[in-house]
C-alpha cells in the first residue's frame, strides 16, 4: 500500500530515538484477577485490554518487563506478530490518506445523505475527519444523534476498518433506511491519526498506543486517559510521560480529545454511542474508575440500562459484557466522561482477534459481527432507558444525579 511521502531524515531520527526503548509484547504470568491487573496498570504499565485466567500481555520495554520479573512475575517475551505492517497481502487496511479518500468517495457517491465534517485537527495537523449520515442537508439538532468513533489507540487499526464498514452498511442495508430519516448518525473513523501513521512508519509494527504530542521531551499521551471525569483519580492511569497509560499533564491536554469534547458539547442531541477498541472481545460500560456497580454518581435506572445494552450487544456480537472496571480500573476514559460528565449512554466495544494486527481477511467478518450492535445503539438513541421500560419524556434522557 502507499505510505505517502516521508522525509528520510525525520524517519531516521524517529526510528533511532525509539530504538533504545522499543515496545514489544511480553506474556506476564501470575496475574489472575482484576486486582492483579489494576496493580500493574497503577504502575503505568500497558497490559492491553485482554485478560486470560492466569496471565496478561504487557506491551512495553525490556526494562519494564525486567521490573516485573523482580516483583516475582514470570515474564516471557513474544515474537512480533509480523515483520511488516500492511503488507500487500493485507491491502484491505487503510492508512490515513486512504481512509480520508474512502470517506470522500463515499460522500461523493451519496451527496444528499453523507455530509463530511471535521472534529478539528490532530497535534501534527491531520484533519480528524468524520461523516454525518442523514437526509437533512444541515445538522439537525432536534433529531436524536448517535456517535461512533475508532482508534483512540494508534495500534488498533482494526477499529478504523470496522467503523468504515459500518459507515458503508448504513446506506447499503435497506432495512435500516428509516434511521437515515430519523437520526443524525455521526461517525469518526480515527481519533488518533498521528499515532496510527507513526505505528506503521518504516513498514513495520511499533506497537504504538498513544498520540504523538510531546511532553517533557517524551512523545505521547494515552487519549483514553485524558478525559476530565475522574481524571487521574484512582490509579487507573499514569502521571509519568514514559508510561503507556500517561494521562497527560492535565485533562483535555490533547487536541484530539479536546476536539471531541467540543463536538459533544455542541451536540446535545447525541444520547449514546460506541467507542471501538481491540482486541479483548468485550462490551464495556461505565464506570471504569470504581469497582462499585452503582456508585453515588450513577442511578439504578442507568445501571440497569447499561446492563440491558450490554446483554443485547452480547446476544448479537457474542462478546462478554461487563462493567469496565471488571477488566481493571481506568480513570479519565471516554466511557466515564460521556456518562459522568454529559449523561450520555456510551459503550466501549473491544473487538476480537489474536493480536493488534490481524490480517485483512479478518476485517469483513468482524465488521458484520458488530453491525447489529451498531444498529441497536442507533435505534435506541431517542431514549436509551426505554429498553428498561423507563420513558424519557419530551426532554430526552433524564439527568444524572448530582456529582
Predicted regions, residues:
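Positively charged n-region of N-terminal signal peptides that target proteins for export
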Residues: 1-5
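Bacterial N-terminal signal peptides
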Residues: 6-14
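M14 metallocarboxypeptidase catalytic domain recognition
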Residues: 19-403
